[in-house]
Amino acid sequence: MDNIKKLGLTALAGSMVATAAHSAELSASGSWALSYTSEDDDAVNGQAFTMGDSVTFTGSGELDNGFTASVKYELDGGNFDDEQLKLDMGDMGEFAYGESNSGYGIDIASNMVPAVDTAIYSAVGTDTVSYGVARSAQDTGNLGYKLALDGGLTVSVEAARNTSAGGTDNTYGVTYTGIDGMTLAAGTGMTATGGTAEVESTTFGVKYATGGFTFGLQLTDVETEGSTEDEDGVHMGVTYNVNDDFTVGYVRQETDFSGNSSDEEHSGIQASYSMGSISFSGRVSKVDNMAGTAGSSDEDKHITMSIAF
């Protein structure tokens, strides 16, 4: 009986060693960031001061065939909300799967407009939808593929299937960087997450950098099945690098609703400044006619201090 026990313990120890040999080490990273936001007196948005509260765990390894496999988990506010598995196959492109799996399909083409702080359509306001912006596939169960070709051409596709409520999302994107200083982009997609009405997005963008200036323009059409309120978005912006430490920018977006709604208008100025390991970024933004509702407006002033260590 003792010999049988010893044999069992030896086998168990061997299996544990074998498992450990195939495990990947994860590194953890976080950030030091303190933000302050001031909005309209009638806005109720909780605490004005906030801090960065996310920790990202990453790991990667190279396979015998030269491919690189990587994994990422983000712990945000005490919850794991962003996970991604990626397989980089070199000249054959890369696959990625996970939640909040951005950067594939129409995402690579949906915003060519430069910003110093954040995209203007997400800077201010209480909209739960960024109107006039291309819809990408849902976060959960998102499968993406991207391939960089010779000559500066990159193509990408993403897909997601909601198995509980039905609905399939498929989007596609392409960018071209073969002209010095210029990026051209186009994307299209059909999203129907959760079995709701299908939403068709089509977008075209251009970005051009010369000297310290970067200019961007994005034209987007969003059509929702069964709705008369289709969206035509015009998004533009310019940034200027005054020097290596100081950058300023102006951004604007206008969304025309094809029905009787008023045009939604976002605008703002942004700036960033760094001195050694300390950096600041901020914005002053406003939105008029939120979600097409005449007279519904909001403004905000926001600044973030970050320390790298």
Q: What residues fall within each predicted segment?
A:
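Outer-membrane beta-barrel proteins
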Residues: M1-F309
